[in-house]
Curated annotation (Swiss-Prot):
It comes from the Bacteria. It is found in: Cell inner membrane. This is Glycerol-3-phosphate acyltransferase. Its main location: membrane. It is a multi-pass membrane protein. The keyword Lipid biosynthesis applies. The keyword Lipoprotein does not apply. It comes from Citrobacter koseri (strain ATCC BAA-895 / CDC 4225-83 / SGSC4696). GO terms for biological process: phospholipid biosynthetic process.
Length: 205
């Protein structure tokens, strides 16, 4: 089945290139997320500029565009190595989307969706790690960084044959968050609660 893997890689990249943040903001009449807030077309920035409803829509779509190509390849019996490349292709499409001038998000939700087909137990643990980190720290970016660091160890425990591809995916996410890591180190990163507070003050209901 690895013969179809190159085509699946291209398909995954094209799926990832559909920027839900930009499309949702256009449909909802919101500012372009690439030019507003943090400038990152992802769910967290859409939460800042558009509120919870728009952010949830972006989050769900971003998860699905990582999940569906990998799930399809997994069902067809593609080997773990190629599955890893397909997952990375979906994230690369999200980060550098061919349909939107190669300016995309950071790939966290798409990576989470790409890992989900490995197993719901792993998915639950990963989601719990992100949520717990965000609740304790208030930093969405720190939740993504911690989850990316721990993901290979979780996978090694649940399904060790996928450790290498998930490690590659984690490296991509960490590289994409290098600016956030620097801001966290300098204590200049904005907490997600602050973003929500500013949104309420700007648009009181």
């Amino acid at each position: 089945m690895s013969a179809i893997a190159p085509g699946m890689i291209l398909f995954a990249y094209l799926c990832g290139s559909i920027s839900s943040a930009i499309l949702v903001c256009r449909i909802a009449g919101l500012p372009d997320p690439r030019q507003s807030g943090s400038g990152n077309p992802g769910a967290t920035n859409v939460l800042r500029i558009g509120g919870k409803g728009a952010a949830v829509a972006v989050l769900i779509f971003d998860v699905l565009k990582g999940m569906l190509p990998v799930w399809g390849a997994y069902a067809l019996g593609v080997t773990p190595f190629w599955l890893g490349l397909i997952a990375i292709a979906a994230c690369l499409g999200h980060i550098w989307p061919v349909f939107f001038g190669f300016k995309g998000g950071k790939g966290v939700a798409t990576a989470f969706g790409a890992i989900a087909p490995i197993g719901w137990d792993l998915t639950g643990v990963m989601a719990g790690t992100w949520l717990l980190t965000v609740l304790l720290s208030g930093y969405s970016s720190l939740g993504a960084i911690v989850s990316a660091l721990i993901a290979p160890f979780y996978v090694w425990w649940f399904k060790p044959q996928f450790t290498f591809p998930v490690s590659m995916l984690s490296c991509l996410i960490l590289l994409r968050h290098h600016d956030n890591i620097q801001r966290l180190w300098r204590r200049q990163e904005t907490k997600i609660w602050t973003k929500l507070k500013k949104k309420r003050e700007k648009d009181p209901q």
